[in-house]
Amino acid sequence: MRKPGNIYTRITNPTTAAIEGGVEALATASGMTAVTYTILALAHAGDHVVAASTIYGGTFNLLKEPLPRYGITTTFVDVDNLEEVEAAIKDNTKLVLIETLGNSLINIPDLEKLAEIAHKHQIPLVSDNTFAIPYLINVFSHGVDIAIHSATKFIGGHGTTIGGIIVDSGRFDWMASGKFPQFVDEGSSCHNLSYTRDVGAVAFIIAVRVQLLRDTGAALSPFNAFLLLQRLETSSLRVERHVQNAETIVDFLVNHPKVEKVNYPKLADSPYHALAEKYLPKDVGSIFTFHVKGGEEEARKVIDHLEIFSDLANAADAKSLVVHPATTTHGQLSEKDLEAAGVTPN
């Protein structure tokens, strides 16, 4: 801690890099590791999380099942309803967790208004920016304090490498908040280090690195870091082509007689069209969902008869992929939770 540097691969190595304009970033073994570390760094036993109901099924299940066993509870909210979001915040709430583009509703939260609510209550706004990626939006310019990525998706882009990234904007004032003594008070694990006093703006990410990453070890391997850094260089070009392909398919589906609905914020009739123009003027990405007329059987028939698309869940691959969220990415959710997430059998 006296001198920064690469002392051990599990903690840091020279083939990991910071992105997105934050003050510091931490690479992890997977996107779910990035989510888990972020939550565990902010919330401890007896604490509370407010989370969007329209998040990835794995994150939803983490918050609903294992974390309550460790004393961390969550209230899931409709992030379109700002009054509901604020009403859910308690004295022991430690973060508001959203996704820039929701998985699988592809909804866009009002980042600036949510940031205003979170900051009013002295807690950070955390956004999983996996589906949007920094090329399409800099979430920090809209009030987000911490960004999370599954680097497996658009950053990796080839379905061969698992990784995650946590990026700290460095803008949240942990000391002024009064709710995060773990970053302010002297701790015994690092010889009476106070993160806010001794490392300043990078207090959060350093705490994650020297506590959670060091002590639990879910580090990104140097080789995977090398692959992700290589592919990051072409991410803008790949995303542009992804978007072109997506728009062509969306146009086809919108006009298909057997399609009930298409969720894609760029569509003029999307409830998120105005937010897309505000927050994602460059483009809204290439992930979309659609509902066929009928039920799960009809949805399965569509998937089974596709020739170009592979039935795989690792979004943003170089291959064209399709998935049935209700039985895969969100398969562990109850019917009530699926409904809240906007995931239907069809």
Positions of PLM-derived features:
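Glycine-rich, flexible loop/turn motifs
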Residues: 4-7, 102, 150-151, 209, ...
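Conserved PLP-enzyme active-site core in the AAT-like
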Residues: 25-256, 263
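A glycine-/small-polar-enriched, mobile loop at the entrance of the PLP active site in fold-type I
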Residues: 1-21, 26
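Short clusters of hydrophobic/aromatic residues that line enzyme substrate/ligand-binding pockets
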Residues: 8, 155, 322
